[in-house]
């Protein structure tokens, strides 16, 4: 049986860049890594609490962290930044204060920037959140997958594969269902493929959603 490698790690340095950009001594590396995780979790929790969205999509595509000795620069790539900014007029400042408290950064400045991504539904994280919202509302998984594929087609991608695993539709036996539209060349390294794995808690148990999106070839 073929073993699947993570498409993002497989393409690092060719079509994929790192989401954290900093250097540290080997003995301090683990602290830096934990700090990154803390920043990402804190931002996601804040957005979840303070954004009231009808579709259940928070719309965070990715969070990039750049560190220097005296500065931490956090760039949040969002599909719908208006929702965050409109729901709280001082949303970004509040988030910055929360993060500073959480990290306890005394002699370092923290900077947060929010960047809008052009085609939100061309991003697997946002799409996975959309599918998760549908499954929580007990929409049948096939309908949710088809709707997601329609949304990505509007975002002008070359191919998409969606996989849902777990107790689908509340069935006793867990199974894996998947659907593919267009091309998804996972073994071609120069193919720009975006990927995300997302867990969703439904009343029947946990479902895993995986999404591969083939954007273009270099």
UniProtKB/Swiss-Prot annotation:
Compartment(s) of residence: Plastid, Chloroplast
Main localization (coarse): plastid
Any Gene Ontology CC annotation: cytosolic small ribosomal subunit
Keyword vocabulary terms for this entry: Chloroplast, Plastid, Ribonucleoprotein, Ribosomal protein, RNA-binding, rRNA-binding
Domain of life per record: Eukaryota
Coiled-coil region: none
Record-annotated KH type-2 domain positions: 47-118
CDD domains per record: KH-II_30S_S3
InterPro entries named among the record's database cross-references: KH_dom-like_a/b, KH_dom_type_2, KH_sf_prok-type, Ribosomal_S3_C_sf, Ribosomal_uS3_bac-typ, Ribosomal_uS3_C, Ribosomal_uS3_CS
GO molecular function: rRNA binding; structural constituent of ribosome
Gene3D superfamilies (alphabetical): 3.30.300.20, Ribosomal protein S3, C-terminal domain
Gene Ontology biological process terms from the UniProt entry: translation
Assembly behavior: Part of the 30S ribosomal subunit.
HAMAP family: Ribosomal_uS3_B
NCBIfam families in alphabetical order: rpsC_bact (TIGR01009)
Family, as annotated: Belongs to the universal ribosomal protein uS3 family.
Protein name: Small ribosomal subunit protein uS3c
Source organism phylogeny: Eukaryota, Viridiplantae, Streptophyta, Embryophyta, Tracheophyta
Gene behind this protein: rps3
């Amino acid at each position: 049986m073929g073993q699947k490698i993570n498409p993002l790690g497989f393409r690092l340095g060719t079509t994929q860049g790192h989401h954290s950009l900093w250097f540290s001594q080997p003995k301090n590396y683990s602290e830096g890594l934990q700090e990154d995780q803390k920043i990402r979790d804190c931002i996601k929790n804040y957005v979840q609490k303070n954004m009231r969205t009808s579709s259940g999509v928070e719309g965070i595509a990715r969070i990039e962290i750049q560190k220097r000795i005296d500065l931490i620069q956090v760039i949040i790539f969002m599909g719908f930044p208006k929702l965050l900014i409109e729901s709280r007029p001082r949303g970004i400042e509040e988030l910055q204060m929360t993060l500073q408290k959480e990290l306890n950064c005394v002699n370092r400045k923290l900077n947060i920037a929010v960047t809008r991504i052009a085609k939100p539904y061309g991003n697997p994280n946002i799409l996975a959140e959309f599918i998760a919202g549908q499954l929580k509302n007990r929409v049948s998984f096939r309908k949710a997958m088809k709707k997601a594929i329609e949304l990505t087609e509007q975002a002008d991608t070359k191919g998409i594969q969606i996989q849902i695993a777990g107790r689908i539709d509340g069935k006793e036996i867990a199974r894996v269902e998947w659907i593919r539209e267009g091309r998804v060349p996972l073994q071609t390294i120069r193919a720009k493929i975006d990927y995300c794995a997302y867990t969703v808690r439904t009343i029947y148990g946990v479902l895993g959603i995986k999404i591969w999106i083939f954007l273009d070839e270099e």
